[in-house]
């Protein structure tokens, strides 16, 4: 423990600094309710309940808080957000009991009904005792703190996947191992994987957790071969307690990488370490994989996430309105939800554009405005849009070459045009992050960063909003 710092003084100073940054009394009021503590090089910020902790779901609040603390206290390397264990136990137990009751009324063929669907999450005797004490140095987890079970909207289309994910986080290696989640792009698979990591880390602070995309795993494997560090690569992945691999389908036909993953899988599974895998297809339909690999995927629980039904889509929009502190009538939310039936990302993107247009035009959010935005977005459009076409159109708009947007130039006008093209590809296509990263010649994390940056600029900079608006219309009406 860092004995030179008083956690209470650290937190009081941080909140005072943030008072000049945020005008909302709600944000500061919520932060003042938290209790700080220091563990190693981490400042632990504990909220009394999940409602108060939700203030940290706002990326602006989270980033500002982290920057304020880390800039003021160099000995603190990270902040961790937690909820009072007693309250969290009560909240989750009630939620899971309700879900288990609803599950018992239906027939889930994929579950072994000789075992309980969801174990007693808070039975201390069932928890797995992993090696490594609290002072163990953990590798970078790759887990995004913004994605939690608390802000995952539940509906009939995803309740089984969510319940199984919670169970895997609560009893790593003992409940549904491996857990294989599949579904179309944009339905919430990645959100669940990050939620597993965040919840497990809260329950088991010493746990070694790793989230990777299949692209990350492939790059690590290739780099280990080229640098002669294969042994370190094996040690890195085979000492993990929970390994989550996103978009496994992109390992198809990569025989050497598959062989490495096969042995990693066996090593972890034989040691009762938890594996969670996501894909756009069920194991049986994964082409380019050996039968032995597909059979490994099927030896635990395989569950899918369907496209969200209308009620769930409305609930997602309501949650987004709550997070953005916007009031939108149920009539408008229902209309928006009825226009987007497949991707949660498209659904939320449409709502954010309505917010932005209303803000810039200084008008109320009404049905006329919503209809205009959705018409311009080409809601329920049937034909697919090619990312290459988006790159070419964006480059032409900024009087650049398409190769500039896929190149390495950091010149300001090229950089912003590139990020706008990435944002449009993410918003207007169903192409996965790894594939977009490949198209732009970058890691998928760059696509995520660009999307967030442009999303933020849309609400603040009229020119960015205008450019996005014009480009979107041109692309959809091409």
Curated annotation (Swiss-Prot):
It comes from the Bacteria. The keyword Cytoplasm applies. One of its GO terms (molecular function) is ATP hydrolysis activity. It is found in: Cytoplasm. GO terms for biological process: DNA replication initiation; regulation of DNA replication. ATP binds at residues 186, 188-190. Residues 1-95 are annotated as: Domain I, interacts with DnaA modulators. Its main location: cytoplasm. Keywords: ATP-binding, Cytoplasm, DNA replication, DNA-binding, Lipid-binding, Nucleotide-binding. GO terms for cellular component: cytoplasm; plasma membrane. Pfam families: Bac_DnaA (PF00308), Bac_DnaA_C (PF08299). Signal peptide: none annotated. Residues 96-141 are annotated as: Domain II. SUPFAM superfamilies: P-loop containing nucleoside triphosphate hydrolases, TrpR-like. Residues 142-358 are annotated as: Domain III, AAA+ region. Residues 359-478 are annotated as: Domain IV, binds dsDNA. Plays an essential role in the initiation and regulation of chromosomal replication. ATP-DnaA binds to the origin of replication (oriC) to initiate formation of the DNA replication initiation complex once per cell cycle. Binds the DnaA box (a 9 base pair repeat at the origin) and separates the double-stranded (ds)DNA. Forms a right-handed helical filament on oriC DNA; dsDNA binds to the exterior of the filament while single-stranded (ss)DNA is stabiized in the filament's interior. Oligomerizes as a right-handed, spiral filament on DNA at oriC. Domain I is involved in oligomerization and binding regulators, domain II is flexibile and of varying length in different bacteria, domain III forms the AAA+ region, while domain IV binds dsDNA. Belongs to the DnaA family. PANTHER family: CHROMOSOMAL REPLICATION INITIATOR PROTEIN DNAA. NCBIfam families: DnaA (TIGR00362). This is Chromosomal replication initiator protein DnaA. It comes from Tropheryma whipplei (strain Twist) (Whipple's bacillus). The gene is dnaA.
């Amino acid at each position: 423990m860092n004995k030179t710092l008083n956690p209470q003084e650290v937190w009081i100073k941080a909140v005072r600094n943030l008072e000049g940054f945020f005008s909302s009394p709600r944000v500061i009021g919520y932060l003042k309710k938290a209790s700080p503590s220091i563990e190693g090089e981490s400042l632990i910020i504990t909220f009394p309940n999940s409602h108060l902790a939700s203030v940290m779901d706002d990326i602006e609040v989270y980033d500002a808080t982290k920057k304020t603390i880390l800039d003021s206290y160099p000995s603190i390397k990270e902040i961790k957000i937690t909820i009072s264990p007693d309250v969290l136990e009560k909240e989750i137990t009630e939620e899971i009991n309700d879900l288990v009751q609803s599950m018992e009324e239906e027939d889930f063929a994929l579950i072994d009904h000789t075992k309980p669907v969801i174990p007693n999450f808070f039975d201390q005797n069932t928890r797995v005792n992993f090696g490594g004490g609290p002072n163990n140095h953990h590798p970078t987890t790759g887990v995004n703190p913004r994605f939690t079970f608390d802000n995952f909207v539940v509906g009939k289309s995803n309740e089984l996947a969510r319940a199984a994910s919670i169970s895997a986080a609560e009893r790593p290696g003992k409940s549904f191992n491996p857990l294989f989640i599949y579904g179309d792009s944009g339905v919430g698979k990645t959100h669940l994987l990050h939620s597993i990591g965040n919840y497990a880390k809260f329950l088991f602070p010493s746990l070694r957790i790793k989230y990777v995309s299949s692209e990350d795993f492939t790059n690590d494997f290739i780099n280990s071969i080229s640098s002669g560090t294969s042994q370190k690569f094996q040690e890195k992945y085979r000492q993990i307690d929970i390994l989550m691999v996103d978009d496994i389908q992109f390992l198809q036909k990569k025989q050497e990488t598959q062989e490495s993953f096969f042995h990693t899988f066996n090593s972890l599974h034989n040691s009762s370490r938890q594996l969670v895998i996501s894909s756009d297809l069920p194991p049986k339909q994964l082409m380019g994989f050996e039968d032995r690999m597909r059979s490994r995927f099927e030896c635990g629980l395989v569950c899918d996430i369907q496209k969200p039904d209308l009620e769930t889509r409305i609930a997602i929009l309501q949650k987004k309105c709550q997070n953005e502190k916007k009031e939108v009538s149920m009539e408008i939310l229902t209309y928006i939800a009825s226009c987007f039936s497949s991707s949660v990302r498209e659904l939320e993107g449409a709502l954010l554009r309505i917010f932005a247009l209303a803000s810039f035009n200084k008008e109320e959010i009404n049905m006329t405005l919503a209809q205009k935005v959705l018409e311009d977005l080409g809601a329920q459009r049937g034909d697919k849009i090619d990312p290459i076409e988006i790159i070419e159109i964006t480059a032409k708009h900024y009087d650049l070459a398409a190769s500039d947007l896929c190149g390495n130039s950091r010149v300001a006008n090229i950089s912003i045009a590139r990020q706008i093209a990435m944002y449009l590809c993410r918003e207007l296509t169903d192409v996965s992050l790894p594939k977009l990263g490949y198209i732009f010649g970058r890691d998928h994390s760059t696509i995520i960063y660009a999307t967030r940056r442009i999303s933020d600029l849309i609400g603040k900079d009229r020119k960015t909003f205008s450019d996005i608006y014009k480009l979107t219309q041109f692309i959809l009406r091409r």
